[in-house]
Amino acid sequence: MANSSPVYDWFQERLEIQDIADDIGTKYVPPHVNIFYCLGGITLVCFLIQFATGFAMTFYYKPTVAEAYTSVQYLMTDVSFGWLIRSVHRWSASMMVLMLILHVFRVYLTGGFKRPRELTWVTGVTMAVITVSFGVTGYSLPWDQVGYWAVKIVSGVPAAIPVVGDFMVELLRGGESVGQATLTRFYSLHTFVMPWLLAVFMLMHFLMIRKQGISGPL
């Protein structure tokens, strides 16, 4: 590049950043692509909003059965723009699920799951399961009446599974009944385990799309 800066030259010599930029900037976009092919990208934007607003709320949320509800109340009433942060988190969560469902329908109806993109489809379905699990775990965190009974019902569902059902229920709840251990587990899953899992599968998903390209029309 003509008249490049010393900083640019330093990075170019070591990382060949111009080649990366050229590859990204010259990627061919098929002519059949329309607005419905943006649904996956919108889902990603919603996830980034979720990450940012969720991270902000961790500064005030207290994951204990005695203080969870009051900490959410404090966030909503006393923290500057706390009500807005939590509201955006809730709205974006609903939007993320909606965009994900529409994205799955678009991929299925256009045959994007067929060979050679089977693994891309598998990673996408895995991310859909994780996203729904986000909703289940996050619903319980305020630890109000709705959240408490929701987690009690959801954590009791595996009891119907033969042999390992009772073990899975106790693993989810952290004991025989719903309590502090349950809230701690759901908080850990919601704020640490699931975000990392989703990020890993997103990376795999995007790399496969990058390698194989966008599927063609039916």
From Swiss-Prot:
Binding-site list for heme b 1: 103, 205
Gene Ontology terms: biological process: photosynthesis; respiratory electron transport chain
GO cellular component, one term: plasma membrane-derived thylakoid membrane
CDD domains documented for this protein: Cytochrome_b_N
Residue stretches spanning the membrane: 35-55, 93-113, 119-139, 189-209
Binding site residues for heme b 2: 89, 190
GO molecular function: electron transporter, transferring electrons within cytochrome b6/f complex of photosystem II activity; metal ion binding; oxidoreductase activity
Entry's localization field: Cellular thylakoid membrane
PANTHER family linked to this entry: CYTOCHROME B
Protein name: Cytochrome b6
Organism annotation: Synechococcus sp. (strain CC9902)
Taxonomic lineage: Bacteria, Bacillati, Cyanobacteriota, Cyanophyceae, Synechococcales
